[in-house]
A protein has these predicted regions:
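Small-residue-rich hydrophobic transmembrane alpha-helices
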Residues: 41-104, 138-157, 263-327
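Signature of the first transmembrane helix
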Residues: 6-66, 233-255
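Interhelical loop/hinge segments that connect adjacent transmembrane helices in multipass membrane
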Residues: 1-12, 190, 199-242
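Helix-terminus/linker motif at the lipid-water interface of multi-pass membrane proteins
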Residues: 20, 24-42, 111-118, 174-181, ...
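Residue-level recognition of transmembrane alpha-helices
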Residues: 12, 19, 45-48, 92, ...
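Short membrane-interface helical motifs at transmembrane helix boundaries
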Residues: 98-129, 318-345
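Short runs within selected transmembrane alpha-helices of multi-pass transporters and secretion channels
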Residues: 62, 66, 131-149, 157-168, ...
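Membrane-interface helix-loop junctions in multi-pass transport and translocation proteins
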Residues: 165-199, 325-332, 341-342
Length: 349
């Protein structure tokens, strides 16, 4: 099982598009809200990263799920991949219901103590009230993505990502500007986009995946679930901790003023692109390594990792140069506010 650069890229690109989907939803919200006002742009930073921190709990669990599925796939125990997949679906479905309730009930109490501006606080709560519904679709989506990446069949992820963006952009424009729903409209559009992406993968799994080969029948296996949790709890913790400091950073910036918060949001949105590249290659590496270990081909691990590293630099390097060279264009794309545009050196930093 000697993976070539082309094979690695063909597996990774849909994964990258899939991870980029979640970030592009936040970026699109920021771009549209940047043309509404500083309060909305700043509030989208706080609410977006707050939502993302919760989302990363599911994302972290999906990493462990993907590793287990990939291992079974490499061992050619294909029916076990389906059994493992359903344990992941059960856990993610239960967790997302609890998290949605907590978001609605606890968020106002937590954020009221952290956010000083009443305007920004109200805008953040309005956003989260609608955005939290997106978790009901994004968590099952994560389970589907883990399965497809684990069996190295990832083309459908690109279609799902395109569907999400095709829904998010027009609905953002319609709900924010035409129906004057402001930041609530952005949250509605984002949740609809995640629903669309989920439906794409659901239909693909139902129609195209060999359900007999992969044992895709509803079954509960407590032992598999416990083993899955032992693997996933650490990736859940790591994923949450990797994002939570960003929220604390934005809370600190909010105390400086709405303009500073808006500028920081633009900076984070640009840097998110590089986060996506790193995350996608990490996800692909985890799947390929698990498949190789399952197939008993440990000698291929380091050559594959070296190839992934080279591809990562080849993709990320030019984008860094473009971000540094075209920062003035980036600012103008987000906002037409002269006050924000004069602070362009933050982007250079």
């Amino acid at each position: 099982m000697n993976y070539t650069y082309k094979q690695i890229w063909l597996i990774n690109f849909p994964v990258m598009m899939s991870i980029l989907m979640e970030q592009l939803i936040n970026i699109t919200d920021a771009i549209f809200l940047g043309h509404v006002g500083e309060v909305e742009l700043g509030a989208s930073a706080l609410s977006g990263i707050y939502y993302l921190a919760v989302y990363m709990l599911g994302f972290g669990f999906s990493i462990g799920l993907q590793v287990m599925i990939a291992r079974r796939n490499g061992e050619q125990h294909y029916k076990e991949t389906g059994r493992t997949f359903f344990q992941g679906v059960y856990f993610l479905s239960g967790m997302v219901v609890i998290l949605c309730l907590l978001l609605h009930l606890a968020s106002p109490l937590i954020l009221r103590r952290l956010i000083t501006s009443d305007e920004i606080f109200r805008a953040v709560i309005h956003y989260l009230d609608w955005r939290s519904f997106g978790l009901l679709f994004s968590f099952p989506f994560l389970a589907f993505r883990s399965f497809l990446v684990g069996i190295t069949t990832t083309k459908a992820l690109s279609v799902a990502a395109i569907m999400a963006i095709c829904i998010n952009i027009p609905f953002n424009y319609l709900l924010i500007f035409k129906l004057n729903l402001g930041i609530s409209g952005a949250a509605m559009a984002s949740s609809l986009a995640e629903f669309g992406a989920f439906i794409v993968l659901l239909l693909y799994m139902w129609v195209r995946v060999d359900k007999v080969k992969y044992g895709l029948k509803v079954v509960y296996d407590g032992k598999v679930l416990i083993k899955l949790l032992r693997i996933s709890v650490w990736s859940m913790l790591h994923s949450f901790v990797s994002v939570a400091p960003w929220f604390l950073f934005f809370v600190a910036i909010e105390h400086l003023g709405r303009t500073e918060l808006a500028i920081s949001n633009i900076t984070r949105s640009v840097s998110t692109v590089f986060f996506v590249i790193v995350n996608s290659f990490a996800s692909t590496t985890g799947s390929l390594v698990s498949n190789l270990i399952g197939a008993g081909q440990g000698k291929e691990l380091f050559p594959v990792c070296h190839k992934v590293l080279r591809l990562g630099y080849a993709v990320g390097g030019p984008l860094i140069v473009m971000a540094l060279w075209g920062n003035q264009w980036v600012i103008g794309f987000y906002t037409n506010n002269d006050n924000l545009s004069t602070s362009i050196w933050y982007i250079r930093l």
